Amino acid sequence: NNRISGSLDIYQQKTSDLLMQKKVPSSTGYSLAWDNVGKTENKGVELVINTQNFNQKDFSWNTDYTFTLNREKITELAGGIDRDISNGWFVGHSIKTHYGLEKIGIWQLDEAEEAAKYGEKPGRIKIKDQNKDGSIDNDNDRVILGSETPDFVMGLNNTFKYKNFDLRVFMYWRQGQMLHSEANG
């Protein structure tokens, strides 16, 4: 009786000559310039399920469920390089990759002596010494921290109708992504 419907889309898209704004040296007088920066690949699944849970003369209740899984990665960067650190682009990773120093906690009072070796003191953020050389520096200790692309996205929308009144309750869930606050750098 057509109470359940839905759709499933599976996709794969390859993009070449990806046009994006790229950071340029300040000596140019500009901070960004448009450039063909490389190639990407996107693939994923989108699922939508619609249900009519209850449908009478004066009252109805419908539910829409969505699930999206997307995997995008840079497959090639212009100039044959495998990383563009200033723009945060890395072959094999998302366009919106976060690259930086890995924060592993807060220096504690009983770690004061160890913290001092890194020029730090208790109460400050503890950074992981990736190459274990006893020094924290941007050249040797930055790593890929994560991506702004979520692992998956889900949505649930319930619509209740009673005579001439509608009530919609919508829930949206993004799982496994990093967020970047411009206010905090």
Give the ranges of each region predicted by the language model.
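Membrane-embedded beta-strands that build the outer-membrane beta-barrel scaffold
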Residues: 1-12, 45-53, 61-69, 154-160, ...
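Extended, folded domain segments that form the structural surfaces/walls around functional sites
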Residues: 1-27, 35, 42
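Flexible, surface-exposed loop regions and adjacent strand-edge segments
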Residues: 16, 22-29, 78-87, 184-185
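Flexible, solvent-exposed coil segments and beta strand-coil junctions
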Residues: 22-32, 131-139
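Short acidic-hydrophobic sequence patches enriched in Asp/Glu that either
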Residues: 29, 39-41, 57, 175
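Short sequence motifs at beta-strands and strand-loop junctions characteristic
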Residues: 37-43, 95, 146-151
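Conserved small-residue
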Residues: 52-148, 179, 183
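C-terminal beta-barrel architecture of Gram-negative outer-membrane proteins
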Residues: 167-185
